[in-house]
């Protein structure tokens, strides 16, 4: 069961925003405070907005509307694909193809080409269609490129009515196309984002893997519930005093611009200022873990 409580959000690092110098002032209503050079997101607002988004997404999908999940940053790719497939919806988790929405007819031709090549691969007809090994290799490379870019939307017959985005600042082109065509946009918005571009903004860390996974799992459940599937009801709770949030923060920037996070009394890990994400591991003493593989 997805639990969107202040305690759970704290444990997954949702409250960590970006450096204060990188913030978008329009995020002010969702910022609790600033500590040691970074903004701390108000998790009471996160819980409230997550519930609003869940209810709206459930209602919209119950009306037959389709969802396109978008998240091309490394931290989001796996969860985007997993939760889109689980909810039987569509996804883009690598490069956003410019014009995917606004030039849909052209994209449909590329999807048709992808399906043709997949059919050739399935019945081993590459060698029958072309004469040389070089041509076969060229076709296989084309297939892999199309599959990587369009594989998550190859069964998308029409433009969807809803887009769910991880990091709308990074996915700026996708958001612009969606707004132009009137799609309902749901998004996790960090402190450097413009929430006014989003119909249903959810304030939170859009860099931490566990935070991203929590949001996507919850919203995927909303889609499943809306389309008649059976999922455990998520729990939305504001059961932790928000003033405790800033007190849990243990990090600071050193003189070289490195972000220092206490992992234990005997060791420290640093993270460059250009990589703002961090996750918190629950323990008696707050511990912050950096995703070293990302």
Swiss-Prot record:
The lineage of its organism: Bacteria, Pseudomonadati, Spirochaetota, Spirochaetia, Leptospirales. Belongs to the universal ribosomal protein uS2 family. Residues 256-274 have a biased composition (Basic and acidic residues). GO terms for biological process: translation. PANTHER family: 30S RIBOSOMAL PROTEIN S2 PROKARYOTIC AND ORGANELLAR (PTHR12534), SMALL RIBOSOMAL SUBUNIT PROTEIN US2M (PTHR12534:SF0). Residues 256-294 are annotated as: Disordered. Gene3D superfamilies: Glucose-6-phosphate isomerase like protein, domain 1, Helix hairpin bin. It comes from Leptospira interrogans serogroup Icterohaemorrhagiae serovar Lai (strain 56601). Pfam families: Ribosomal_S2 (PF00318). One of its GO terms (cellular component) is cytosolic small ribosomal subunit. The gene is rpsB. The keyword Transmembrane does not apply. Keywords: Ribonucleoprotein, Ribosomal protein. SUPFAM superfamilies: Ribosomal protein S2. The keyword Cell membrane does not apply. InterPro entries: Ribosomal_uS2 (IPR001865), Ribosomal_uS2_bac/mit/plastid (IPR005706), Ribosomal_uS2_CS (IPR018130), Ribosomal_uS2_flav_dom_sf (IPR023591). Residues 280-294 have a biased composition (Polar residues). One of its GO terms (molecular function) is structural constituent of ribosome. This is Small ribosomal subunit protein uS2.
